[in-house]
Swiss-Prot record:
This is DNA gyrase subunit A. It catalyses: ATP-dependent breakage, passage and rejoining of double-stranded DNA. Heterotetramer, composed of two GyrA and two GyrB chains. In the heterotetramer, GyrA contains the active site tyrosine that forms a transient covalent intermediate with DNA, while GyrB binds cofactors and catalyzes ATP hydrolysis. It comes from Mycoplasmoides gallisepticum (strain R(low / passage 15 / clone 2)). GO terms for cellular component: chromosome; cytoplasm; DNA topoisomerase type II (double strand cut, ATP-hydrolyzing) complex. Gene3D superfamilies: 3.30.1360.40, DNA gyrase/topoisomerase IV, subunit A, C-terminal, Topoisomerase II, domain 5, Topoisomerase, domain 3. The gene is gyrA.
Length: 846
């Protein structure tokens, strides 16, 4: 080794080449530099043009390649290579993926790239390789690049200082809010939804002339997100949040339609899906839920989407409520999603969360800056042109002398200097005169120069006015926005469902309809729409309403709304609650399902009474046992009932609950007895009691085997309907029943004979309702009460339903007629009346 080399090595080793540093501080500094690099140069959009660097470079690269919307398509690979070579020295796949997304109609609300070829699909299919696809700028991109050659934005050196690239685009098109943006930086993320261009322009124009406009005012123009895949937004709570704070969550739901099919089947047709949802994955998820039996009721699933749009068909099984099934799909799949908004963008190279007004104001300020820079550029250019033309005009006005001066000059420099001195011209003017062509000396050209100078002076005056007059600048920007709106504005795609809650409740999509709830003695329950039973004349034989097991009989039925609460009172004195729609829908002849499948009753616990209710805030529950005990409890005591039930009444041995009704607190109570007697007394003679109370005597029985068969309150009607087990009944004015004391035996309400059988129900009615009757064999008849005659107390009534010898009438229910669309069917001898005595004979039994 050369001795000099050894000395150099020693000298190098003696120098400090390793810098000591705290690892904590070094990590902190290095990580912050990396984080800011990601934030500023990669992940977050610039607030003025809504673009990340790679998007801006793709657009500018295509622009410098001449690939505007009016030029032929070029291979995508050529664009990617140009961008990568000059502006973005990173992966070609990153550039191509960016370009692909800007060309997808389901990704961007307003596409910035006009793609030709396979650019992927909403099913998640990848775009074809860049060597196969072609692209160019879209028409709307021209508005983002408009006037970029007029010194409207600053340029910086590219990565190797061989080219210059813009740090922001002029972007007359409000891209940040129109197309939105998403990205994940270090410690922060942005997710800005797209909006409707016409709405944005309306809001921008309002803010242009009303600097102090509130966000509430801007909401009159800008309604909320407008996604390229349309769909529906639930409520405006999330919209209000991010409009005001820049952050919020918007619930987006697929648009669906229900097509009714034969055999009680339906098709649920999905025509729009939430933004950024992969359609193929969505369908696979539904299929998986069906396969694992997490969702039941789907018979078939088809994707019938085509060029016309999305169409996902979900065929239901028989008797499945499509609204409930759809609601289950909303809960379990991406048919409903939450779009978490974070309007984070770069403002002066610093990340900032923007509310709606701030985002719009940044756009407006940017456009003012663009307009001022453009105007200054054009003014400078116009003044330069005017300066030259003024010199040419001077020359043409003194053309002979100018020619003579040039002829006598030694050279061009001498001619230039002589002209400058003689006519007080500038260097540029003198050069322009020397460069004049001979044809410019013609009279017509001289006149044209005068006109051109006048135009330039007018232009200069106009440009100077723009710089001095803010109102003029506002008018120019407003007119430009109107032009953009006229070219590219369109109707809103996403529907905003005001007032809807994003929290999914099964009941929200269940139609409100009148239904019949039937209960057998074994506790089997089922629900059937009232429309399943057609209206008949009284005396009809009816239709099969319920199949039962051999040792089971239909015991009762009630008519209620699908959105009513059902209270089940049991022989243990407990009460349970479910919603009426939770009782499974059955056919007229189905057996139903055991109550134990719906409520948590014990093995030996039996249902005794059903009550439908919608309001617990006022009034009372009035109880009657079969042995005649009564009590009343405030309805509010039952507003909260746990799954395991709640004590409702204390029952004595050998007694059971008969019925519970809702009262106002100041009514009259009518209690019917199986022997044909009825007690009428004031409700308030029974004091309000607690839930665990046993009650007081409401009626005394004439016979040991008597029991309570009817319980009504005066608000239910003015006529008392009495029905017997042999299918006969009548209506009597309630005023024919005199007021008695609580605990009395009552007065006659119907004459009981072997032909009538025991009385099974008394009920106050108005007379314009309909009567639903069910026999011991499950046969149901629906009869207008208008066909039941009004008679005196001591009569036996008329035939209501035809029964065979072994059949008895088991239960009745009254309901108001909301819509009579039923067919009437004749009956056998509907006007048959049984023998009666004088109805006015007083046979009161105290």
């Amino acid at each position: 080794m050369n001795p000099n080399d050894k000395n150099n090595i020693k000298e190098l080793l003696n120098k400090t080449v390793v810098k000591e540093a705290s690892i904590t501080k070094e990590l902190e500094t290095s990580f912050m530099e990396y984080a800011m690099s990601v934030i500023v140069s990669r992940a977050l959009p610039e607030s003025r043009d809504g673009l990340k660097p790679v998007h801006r470079r793709v657009l500018y690269g295509a622009y410098t390649s001449g690939l505007t919307h009016d030029k032929p398509y070029r291979k995508s690979a050529q664009i990617v290579g140009h961008v990568m070579g000059k502006y973005h020295p990173h992966s070609d796949s990153a550039i191509y993926e960016t370009m692909v997304r800007m060309a997808q109609p389901f990704s961007l609300r307003y596409m910035l790239i006009d793609g030709h070829g396979n650019f992927g699909s909403i099913d998640g299919d990848s775009a074809a390789a860049m060597r196969y696809t072609e692209a160019r700028l879209s028409k709307i991109s021209a508005e983002m690049l408009r006037n970029i050659d007029k010194d409207t934005v600053d340029f910086v050196d590219n990565y190797d200082a061989s080219e210059q690239e813009p740090i922001v685009l002029p972007s007359l098109f409000p891209n940040l809010l129109a197309n939105g943006s998403s990205g994940i930086a270090v410690g922060m993320a942005t997710n800005i939804p797209p909006h409707n261009l016409s709405e944005l322009i309306g809001g921008i124009k309002h803010l242009l002339v009303n600097e102090n406009a509130t966000i509430e005012e801007l909401k009159e123009f800008i309604k909320g997100p407008d996604f390229p895949t349309a769909a529906e937004i639930l409520g405006e709570t999330g919209i209000n949040e991010y409009f005001n704070t820049g952050r919020g969550s918007v619930s987006v739901r697929a648009k669906s339609e229900i097509e009714e099919l034969a055999n009680n089947k339906s098709n649920i047709v999905i025509t729009q899906i939430p933004y950024m949802v992969n359609k193929a994955n969505l369908i696979n998820k539904i299929a998986e839920l069906v396969k694992t039996e997490q969702i039941q009721g789907i018979a078939d699933l088809r994707d019938e989407s085509n060029r016309e749009g999305i169409r996902i068909v979900i065929e239901t099984k028989r008797d499945v409520i499509p609204e409930v099934l759809l609601n289950q799909l909303y809960k379990s799949t991406q048919l409903q999603t939450n779009f978490s908004v974070a309007m984070l963008a770069l403002v002066n190279n610093q990340p900032k969360v923007l509310n709606l007004k701030e985002a719009l104001q940044i756009y407006i300020d940017h456009q003012f800056d663009i307009l001022l820079r453009k105007t200054n550029f054009e003014l400078k250019k116009a003044k330069a042109s005017a300066h030259i033309v003024e010199g040419l005009v001077i020359a043409t006005n003194n053309i002979d002398d100018v020619i003579e001066t040039i002829k006598n000059a030694k050279d061009n420099e001498d001619a230039k200097n002589t002209l400058m001195t003689k006519y007080e011209l500038s260097d540029l003017q003198a050069k322009a005169i020397l460069d004049m062509r001979l044809r410019s000396l013609s009279g017509l050209e001289r006149e044209n120069l005068q006109k051109e100078l006048a135009k330039l002076k007018e232009l200069i005056k106009d440009l100077e006015e723009i710089l001095q007059n803010k109102e003029r600048r506002i008018k120019i920007i407003s007119d430009q926005l109107d032009e953009i709106d006229h070219k590219f504005g369109d109707e809103r795609r996403t529907k905003i469902c005001y007032g809807l809650n994003s929290t999914i409740d099964n009941e929200q999509l269940i139609p409100v309809e009148t239904v019949v709830i039937t209960r057998s003695s074994k506790g089997y329950l089922k629900r059937i729409p009232i429309s399943a039973y057609k209206v008949q004349h009284r005396g009809g034989v009816g239709v099969k309403g319920m199949n039962t097991y051999e040792d089971d009989d239909v015991e009762s039925l009630i008519v209620c709304s699908t959105h009513s609460d059902l209270l089940f009172f049991t022989n243990y004195g407990k009460v349970y609650r479910i919603r009426a729609h939770q009782v499974p829908l059955g056919s007229r002849i189905s057996k139903g399902i055991p109550a134990i499948n719906l409520i948590s009753i014990e093995k030996d616990e039996k249902l005794m009474s059903l009550l439908s209710i919608n309001d617990y805030d006022s009034g009372y529950f009035f109880f009657s046992t079969k042995k005649g005990l009564v009590k009343r409890v405030k309805a509010s005591e039952f507003s909260r009932i746990q799954n395991n039930g709640k004590i409702a009444i204390k029952l004595t041995e050998n007694d059971s609950l008969f019925k519970v009704i809702k009262t106002a607190g100041d009514e009259e109570i009518y209690i019917g007895v199986s022997s044909g007697l009825l007690v009428r007394f004031k409700e308030d003679v029974v004091r309000s009691m607690g839930r665990t109370a046993q009650g007081v005597i409401g009626v005394k029985f004439k016979n040991p085997n008597d029991e309570v068969i009817g319980l009504s309150s005066s608000h239910e009607g003015s006529l008392l309907l009495a029905v017997c087990e042999k299918g006969v009944g009548k209506m009597t004015d309630r005023e024919e029943y005199r007021m008695t004391n609580r605990g009395s035996k009552g007065v006659i309400t119907i004459k009981v004979t072997p032909k009538t059988g025991n009385i099974i129900n008394t009920q106050l009615v108005n007379g314009n309702e309909e009567l639903l009757m069910i026999s011991s064999t499950g046969k149901i008849v629906r009869v207008p009460l208008a066909e039941v005659s009004e008679q005196g107390r001591n009569t036996s009534g008329v035939k209501l339903i035809s029964l065979n010898e072994k059949e008895t009438l088991q239960s009745v229910a009254i309901f108001d007629v909301e819509q009579d669309d039923s067919q009437q069917v004749g009956s056998d001898n509907p006007d048959t009346e049984l023998s009666s005595d004088d109805s006015n004979q007083d046979q009161d039994k105290e």
